Amino acid sequence: MEGLSSCATNYRISSGRWKKVGTISRYFYDSWAILEYLNTGRLAGYFRSTRGLTTWLQVMEVFYALLRDGRSESEARDLVVALQPHLIDFSFDDVLGAMILRIRMARKRRNLSYVDAIGYYTARKRGLQFLTRDPGFRGLPGVVVP
């Protein structure tokens, strides 16, 4: 797809649109954080003052949730298309690492979904803070739960 790359470009959300800024990626946006921002405007500081990245799996969850919660297909599409410059990819080895992490977390009674495991693993591997409103992540290293 045109416009997608794994390199960090500089954009931010403002009034539903991404605008160019001069900051470096610092956060990994979990689908909870993206939805919280899109639906309530909370977490705006994380989306305006810094750069964040996410994967297409989180975008998939966001798109589904927007449709489920009553947004029109075109409105939901416009919102997730705006995330394209923020997409990063993950490798086969990342998938394996994320599933090992998922098993370890399950043994500690923390049940992560496949998408959450990939997101958290990717954030940790890239040195990004994992921004989420999901209470299941509280207390884990590298997690910001505002």
Region locations from a protein language model:
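Active-site regions of enzymes building and remodeling cell-envelope glycoconjugates
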Residues: 50-54, 85-86, 140-146
